[in-house]
Amino acid sequence: MASSPILILGGTSLVATYLAARLKGTGRTIQLVARRTTSPIAGLPFVPWSELAAGVVPATPGAAVISLLPLPVLISLLPRLTGVRSIAALGSTSVFSKATSDEASERATAGKLAAAERALEDWCGTHGVGMTLLRPTLVYDLVSDRNVARLARFARRFGFVPLAKPAKGLRQPIHADDVAKALLAAVDTPAAFGKRLNIAGGAPLTYRAMVERIFAGLGRKPRLVLLPTAILRVGFSAGSRLGLVREAAFGSSVFSRMNEDLTFDVRDGLELLGYDPRPFDPAGPLRLGDLDAQTVAALT
């Protein structure tokens, strides 16, 4: 089973680079699918998305599929995956955290995720495909993610980070490499088939503590501006209209959630997959202030 060919859907995803690094030297046949005309990861066999979607290049029979695609996109591709052995797909804990958001667009996103989860489970059950759905929490890699790296860019640019006081909502950031570990375990663990598992990083920490560690990773003293949520909403709405805070992409719901505990029960995933996630430490061996795309390339 562990020698099954691997088909990675979503080759430009944040996690893809780490998957490729972990698969090197394993002897497994690897095929990458992405919306590119050339492979986004040098040295890996590559199939353009358009060719797989059109059926020009069929999925390898018996392959273990790892999907990094948004779930609704994966659902549209399922007819082209008939004959594969298993699918390990990434969902999101946003299916829970955004279900009661004060923004209609976020509630709609949660609804689409929930519908896609059901569709994936139904299709895999009908076609005899082993399915494992992994819902990661806040995913980061200290380089190009939309969470930690984006906050770090804001801190670099402005020298401070605004927080909705007291910013005590708990978070469980998970590194992209730990997500890759969990996915690789999932495709080869029959006991995980049919499961929807939440996965997260090490010990939870408050939103405020997370931002303080980001400053430490930049080698800077934390400068936090703690304000009421209502004031931050108005200020960032105005800043967005003026084009001053596009990088941060803060919406009103982001500030509201800074004081919500977005933690999830991950015991089943840890027990079944054994991915042993690292603690959140941007000031650790891979220092946030020193990392760039070339560093990631060197790691792989």
Where are these regions (language model features)?
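Conserved sequence/active-site signature of Rossmann-fold short-chain dehydrogenase/reductase
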Residues: 95, 139, 179
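Substrate-positioning beta->alpha
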Residues: 145-150, 165-187, 194-198
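NAD(P)-dependent short-chain dehydrogenase/reductase
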Residues: 138-170, 214
